[in-house]
Amino acid sequence: MIELEKHYYEKVFGQLKAHFNFKSPSQVPKITKVVVNMTAGNQSSNAKAIEAVLEDLAKITGQKAYKTVAKKSLATWKLRQGMPMGGKVTLRRQQMWNFLAKVLHIAIPRVRDFRGLSPKSFDGNGNFALGFKESIVFPEITFDKISKIRGLDVIIVTSARNDQEGFKLLELLGFPFAKKV
């Protein structure tokens, strides 16, 4: 799955430089990291649910996940500060490119009723957030062996300075954005 990184350096890099009239190659936006996050939801007090989340994340990303804990106490969710909530993995370099290729070529096509990614999911700084309602769109997660279907969030952090640069970068990489109406 190295072809996505190769595609970036051979085609996308030059197209971005020409499109935005960048003078220096260091100005061209690139993907710096991908953060994958999954929570146990209302089962966060259950230690087995947290372990299942960490196992699923490790299977999906190929890297060991670490626990995330609550920053604040919330009585409505029966959550106390420091209580484990889920897991998180930060991917960089080759693992990042492999995971993005898996998302593009395997996970997104398996999403039911997919109508394109929302361009509104950019944060204002060129970073893109993508959510999956079901983790079973990834081939490593089999429906028979999981206790509960959980969703996960994928945050693509770029070096883009604004949303237009980030959008063009991901669009040229092949991310299927929904057409503006």
Curated annotation (Swiss-Prot):
GO term, biological process aspect, one: translation
Ribosomal protein as UniProt keyword: yes
InterPro entries xrefs: Ribosomal_uL5 (IPR002132), Ribosomal_uL5_bac-type (IPR020930), Ribosomal_uL5_C (IPR031309), Ribosomal_uL5_dom_sf (IPR022803), Ribosomal_uL5_N (IPR031310)
Keywords: Ribonucleoprotein, Ribosomal protein, RNA-binding, rRNA-binding, tRNA-binding
One Gene Ontology cellular component annotation held by this UniProt entry: ribosome
Pfam families, sorted: Ribosomal_L5, Ribosomal_L5_C
Molecular function per GO: rRNA binding; structural constituent of ribosome; tRNA binding
Function: This is one of the proteins that bind and probably mediate the attachment of the 5S RNA into the large ribosomal subunit, where it forms part of the central protuberance. In the 70S ribosome it contacts protein S13 of the 30S subunit (bridge B1b), connecting the 2 subunits; this bridge is implicated in subunit movement. Contacts the P site tRNA; the 5S rRNA and some of its associated proteins might help stabilize positioning of ribosome-bound tRNAs.
Self-association and partners: Part of the 50S ribosomal subunit; part of the 5S rRNA/L5/L18/L25 subcomplex. Contacts the 5S rRNA and the P site tRNA. Forms a bridge to the 30S subunit in the 70S ribosome.
Entry similarity comment: Belongs to the universal ribosomal protein uL5 family.
Alphabetized HAMAP family for the sequence: Ribosomal_uL5_B (MF_01333_B)
Name of this protein: Large ribosomal subunit protein uL5
Organism whose genome encodes this protein: Mesomycoplasma hyopneumoniae (strain 7448) (Mycoplasma hyopneumoniae)
